[in-house]
A protein has these predicted regions:
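Short regulatory helix/loop adjacent to the ATP-binding pocket of P-loop NTPases
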Residues: 195-213
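Alpha-helical scaffold elements adjacent to nucleotide-binding pockets in ATP/GTP-utilizing enzyme cores
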Residues: 52-53, 78-85, 175, 197, ...
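Short glycine-/polar-rich loops that comprise or flank the Walker A/P-loop
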Residues: 60-64, 184-186, 211-214
Length: 233
């Protein structure tokens, strides 16, 4: 049976409705290299909005990297996800990704694995650890790549509140802010599903990420904006 509506997951294309103003605003922020914080309760369409904007940006000199860090439990879990996502999204094919690892992370030997599903992407394990790379080196990786390739990178991190749940979280946040605030070829879109944690990270004056970027709060889509979609189905 065909589903007329999709619930509980990010959507694209004709299943994405309204958010016209938010889409235009976020697209402009991405194009102008602005840091953006998206805050809202669960299932308000943050991920779908970011995907929509990514699909609408046609400038080949802007690369949008999306990653979800929900299952990252430690600082170096995050660095491995961060680096792998950036290397994959700034490459056109797997072979180029591996070449970029050799070029930008020379002390690593990546491991590639494939899913049995024919349309699934490959996964890459980098093995980043305190023994081979410092946090600052990994956090500055996108700036190094962007300068080398002559592009601007927009890094979109979903479930960013996980950073606040990690051991020694405050030190991690200070390291991130300390590196990211000086980058000129990279901007960030940070969002998550736990509003109270995100609000504390970005709106608490005592926290390292206070005033890191423009904060946008997504509200529920109004009833009048739902009507055209419902009638069309």
């Amino acid at each position: 049976m065909e589903k007329h509506f999709i619930y509980g997951m990010s959507v694209e294309g004709e299943n994405f409705t309204d958010r016209t103003r938010e889409t235009q605003r976020l697209k402009k922020d991405f194009e102008h290299g602005m840091n953006v914080i998206l805050i809202s309760p669960r299932r308000m369409g943050k991920t779908s909005l970011v995907k929509k904007v990514k699909a609408e940006i046609s400038d080949p000199n802007i690369r949008i990297v999306m990653m979800d860090i929900y299952d990252c439990r430690s600082e170096y879990d995050f660095y491995n996800r961060f680096a792998a996502s950036i290397l994959k999204e700034t490459s056109n094919k797997m072979e180029q990704t591996l070449e970029n690892v050799k070029k930008f992370l020379v002390r690593l030997t990546p491991k590639i694995s494939f899913s049995p599903e024919p349309l699934s992407e490959y996964s890459m394990s980098l093995g980043i650890s305190p023994e081979n790379y410092t946090p600052e080196e990994i956090l500055n990786l996108p700036e190094v790549i962007a300068k080398e390739k002559g592009i601007h990178i927009v890094i979109c991190i979903d479930e960013f509140q996980q950073i606040g749940e990690m051991p020694d979280s405050l030190s991690i946040q200070k390291r991130m802010r300390g590196v990211w605030q000086h980058q000129t070829h990279v901007s960030y879109c940070l969002y998550g599903s736990k509003k109270h944690l995100m609000t504390n990270l970005f709106q608490n004056k005592r926290m390292p990420f206070y005033q890191f970027g423009e904060t946008n709060e997504l509200s529920a889509i109004s009833t009048q904006d739902w009507v055209p979609l419902i009638q069309s189905r």
